Swiss-Prot record:
Subcellular location: Cell inner membrane
The organism of origin for this protein: Shewanella baltica (strain OS155 / ATCC BAA-1091)
Pathway field: Cofactor biosynthesis; ubiquinone biosynthesis [regulation]
Any one GO BP annotation for this protein: ubiquinone biosynthetic process
Name of the molecule in the record: Probable protein kinase UbiB
Enzyme class label: transferase
One cellular-component annotation, GO: plasma membrane
Membrane topology: Multi-pass membrane protein
Purpose of the protein: Is probably a protein kinase regulator of UbiI activity which is involved in aerobic coenzyme Q (ubiquinone) biosynthesis.
Gene Ontology MF terms: ATP binding; protein kinase activity
Enzyme Commission number: 2.7.-.-
InterPro entries: ABC1_dom, Kinase-like_dom_sf, UbiB, UbiB_bact, UbiB_kinase
Length: 549
């Protein structure tokens, strides 16, 4: 551990103690030596005693900077780990930091381009359009076509700082698992590992550019979503150049109302976009908070979304997609037995789980929701409660499903903010039913067979030889099995004969011994003894030697 990491660790602990977060630790994590270290090395007074624990954690993470802010945002979606109060507080964390110097941004951009900015762009503005914890955005005009673009560039040394904080987080998580018995259930090390994968993905702007290109191609003919054009020739790990868009932030409800936006259509399109990305494309935007979503200014009666920041994208396996769709449909039909079966069949919960107990737990959670009108039932919270219930049955955490849950909560919250009467169930159910029909119906079967036809056409000439080889192998197996059976029968015969002789010899020996002690004819006991010895010798020698068949 370097001096810098020790210094950073001290600063993190000091900040957490300033907000009195040691007060919320369970007794298992505060033994006498912890209290001794707390009072001797960290004589910091808790200045926020009157504030709730969730608010104190939010303020501490805000002060600790970008890595902790993003961790807090991720944890806000893990209500299976945190209470609702704490999760709601963390959801309010904003990834807003002061911009870094425009001259440094210019230097970083030119290092990636290996050319002066003015040779490729006009009107480069050193004052950033937006600034976040990992990167900031500058505007310019492309020399080649005169179109407005934005240049997204990583902050200087951001990778080093993030790696150092991640290492510290990982060590802390392992310590928590060691000190706290419940740590194994909460799996803090696993949570930090999921976070590490997510945030390191955001540090590669070339990867983000490729994600944006793929998402754009998926919705080229869509009336619901527009993804700005990416200039791939100017994209590098630390730099991304894309078309500049002019929209209204989805959180600016007043501006959307002023232009006469059709909120009902906009909300329904948001739901359809989510399910299309997940079930049709298997490639969904997993960071759809209001800062990344804008609404078109043209045609407010027929509005569409503009999606930015494709650094975090999610995918599901075909198995996960099918089980998820069936899960939702089973919930629509209040089929709790099927929901429990699906969790076990999918491998999300151990196959050793008590199915009836799990079904009952799901029913206890879900049944009260049906006392509300359908348009008041939260789709995201249904999924959340199901995973929280499954947690008590040792659910295996699926990172891709955590991303899905987070995205669904964002989309649903956004849809109801735009149009409070949004009936998400009515919008989603036909889509899911149609998708399931497409997956298991005759057309789907024909499609799956047709995709395999080239493979089988290539293998068809080999069939006669394969059939002949299998028949030949079958004959060999039959012959081998017959030989084994013959050997086994021979062994059994020898064993029976040997056992018969040994038992007879034992009887003769016992009789001879008993007769010697009685007034029997002189020669009778000795004949029995000699005969018994001879039979024992013959029986012993006739035992089968080889037990391998």
């Amino acid at each position: 551990m370097t001096l810098a990491s020790i210094r950073r660790g001290y600063h993190v602990i000091k900040t957490l103690l300033q907000y009195g977060l040691d007060d919320v630790l369970p007794p298992k994590m505060t033994p006498w030596y912890f209290k001794l270290a707390r009072n001797s090395l960290f004589w910091i007074r808790n200045k926020h005693k009157n504030k709730p624990g969730g608010e104190r954690l939010k303020l501490a993470m805000q002060e600790l900077g970008p890595v902790y802010i993003k961790l807090g945002q991720m944890l806000s979606t893990r209500r299976d780990l945190l209470s609702d109060e704490w999760a709601s507080e963390l959801a309010m964390l904003q990834d807003k930091v002061p911009p870094f110097d425009g001259a440094l941004a210019r230097q970083a951009i030119e290092a990636e381009l290996k050319a002066p900015i003015e040779s490729l762009f006009d009107d480069f503005n050193e004052i950033p359009l937006a600034s976040a914890s990992i990167s900031q955005v500058h505007t310019a005009t492309l020399k080649s076509n005169g179109k407005d673009v934005v240049l997204k560039v990583l902050r200087p040394n951001v990778e080093t700082k993030i790696q150092a904080d991640l290492q510290l987080m990982s060590q802390t998580a392992k310590l928590i698992e060691y000190l706290l018995g419940e740590g194994n259930r909460l799996r803090p090390a696993e949570v930090i590992e999921d976070y590490r994968v997510t945030i390191l993905g955001e540090l590669n702007l070339k990867l983000e550019a490729l994600n944006a290109v793929k998402l754009r191609n998926n919705f080229l003919d869509s009336d619901a979503l527009y993804v700005p054009y990416v200039y791939e020739e100017f994209c590098y790990p630390r730099l991304m150049v894309m078309e500049r868009i002019y929209g209204i932030s989805v959180s600016d409800i007043a501006a959307l109302k002023a232009q006469g936006t059709n909120f009902k259509l906009l909300a329904e399109r948001g739901v359809e976009l989510f399910f299309t990305q997940v079930f049709r494309d298997n490639f969904f935007h997993a960071d759809m908070h209001p800062g990344n979503i804008f609404i078109s200014r043209d045609h407010p009666e027929n509005p569409y979304y503009i999606g930015l920041d494709c650094g975090i994208m999610g995918t599901l396996s075909e198995v996960d997609k099918r089980y998820l769709a069936e899960n939702f449909l089973a919930f629509f039909n209040r089929d709790y037995h099927r929901i429990a079966q699906l969790y076990i069949e999918s491998g999300w919960v151990s196959e050793k789980t008590d199915l009836q107990a799990f079904e009952q737990a799901i029913k206890v959670v879900c049944e009260p929701m049906f006392n509300k009108p359908l348009d008041e039932i939260s789709f995201g919270h249904v999924l959340l409660e199901l995973f929280r219930t499954a947690r008590h049955f040792d659910i295996v955490v699926q990172p891709q499903l955590v991303l899905l849950e987070k995205t669904l909560l964002y989309i649903e919250g956004l849809g109801r903010q735009l149009y409070p009467q949004l009936d998400l169930w009515q919008t989603a159910k036909p889509f899911l039913e149609q998708w399931m029909a497409d997956q298991v119906g005759p057309k789907a079967m024909f499609k799956k067979v047709s995709t395999k036809l080239p493979y089988w056409a290539d293998k068809l000439p080999e069939f006669p030889e394969l059939i002949y080889d299998n028949l030949k192998l079958g004959r060999k197996l039959l012959s081998s099995q017959q030989q084994m059976l013959d050997k086994y029968l021979k062994y059994q015969q020898q064993a029976h004969k040997s056992n018969y002789l040994l038992i007879t010899s034992a009887v003769l020996l016992i009789c001879g011994t008993l007769l010697i002690n009685r007034d029997a004819t002189l020669w009778t006991p000795y004949v029995c003894l000699v005969s018994g010895i001879i039979l024992w010798f013959v029986g012993w020698r006739s035992r089968p030697k080889n037990r391998k068949f």
